[in-house]
Amino acid sequence: MKRFKIVISSLLITVLAVLCFAPTAWAFCGFYVAKADSKLYNQASQVIMARDGDRTVLTMANDFQGEVKDFAMVVPVPTVIKKEQVRVAPPKIVERLDAFSAPRLVEYFDSDPCVEYDRVLNEAVPAPAARARAGAARGSASDLGVTVEARFNVGEYDIVILSAKESGGLETWLNRNGYKIPRGAKQLLQPYVRSGMKFFVAKVNLDKFEESGYQFLRPLQISYQSRKFILPIRLGMINANAAQDLIVYVLSPKGQAEITNYRTVKVPSDANIPVFVKNEFSDFYKSMFQTAYLKEDRKVAFLEYAWDMSSCDPCSAEPLNPEELKQAGVFWLDNNSSNDEPFPPSSRRPPIVSSSVFITRLHIRYTRDKFPEDPIFQATSNQESFQGRYILQHPFTGELKCQAGREYKRSLPKRFEQEAQTLAKLTNWNIQDIRRKMKLTVGDLNSSWWGNFFSWLVGM
């Protein structure tokens, strides 16, 4: 049995997990050294959906780039939204969820194989068997078949709630009223109009934006009650020339969320890869994701993380505290909250968080031809934990004078080659390029593990 020594790396964020010695616990042990967060993707949108029963709190991160006066957001919603159901959320809350659930890189260091096994065993601390889950416009609207259901201001946003009889009239109304929507919106608006959905329309109030002191637009958060558990993404495809990335964080009191009208596939995980990837993790993850995306014919949602939010192992960021969970839209923590209230009042006693929030992180790369329908979600009671996790295993570089050390040394070339093959398969990178890079990572063991293999044997 191989024994491993684990140490902290300071590449990005270093968070201490639990020292793991028991083989049955190795699946989620190690130290976090890097993460593949949403910043890897230039056009990645992020959405939080907190869902319990038929109640949803939808938080939309605002990744708009350009002059704020040109900003317009049109979101189909299943019901008329009132002012008290809308708020602006702290921008940091999306970043916190992203950091907490991002795919991660962990590393291990082989211990000295010559250390007597019994002594190591006696000194090792067993890992737990299970982790604790620890006005004029209104007149023209009627002519166009558009009804203004509500009009109000929240934070830096002016918001209008619309219903429409036909998509052409809705498109005309939006353009006449100064909402700069892309050409071709009529075709994509039509299915939502036919299904009786309403439209949440927002633009920036420049005076209030300047008063706010913020440099960027804050996330909008909407609460509503509906049996429909969908995420309308088709409007985002109007001007898309390439595939777009969407990161969805679903928060539930029950367990994992899944998509019912598209397959959900776990992102490749728990792979041992060469140690040089530590300095190229962003490139690695982008290549690996694209390879898996093409392999699945570009029409699946990828599960990147699923976990009870009261714990993590290893932790890429600290779990969210109760106040942060509320900011993310979680409304069921306070047992005294009324079913009639879209959000729990902040004046109530702080809730006690146990295992009552489960996060599912889904990564969808979509195009109009492969994702013709909006994803439909459902909550499940499945609390199986999963994370995108990639393992670096550093070889022992000290002096080896025992039989176990010689056997360990003999096993390394095969291990390195397996890591190279795994990396090539995951990323579609050239195997020869991988081997050349690995030559620089073996360090003090030798200058070229495949070129000097026989010289290793000579010294045995």
What are these regions (language model features)?
Residues 22, 120-210, 435:
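Long alpha-helical, hydrophobic tracts
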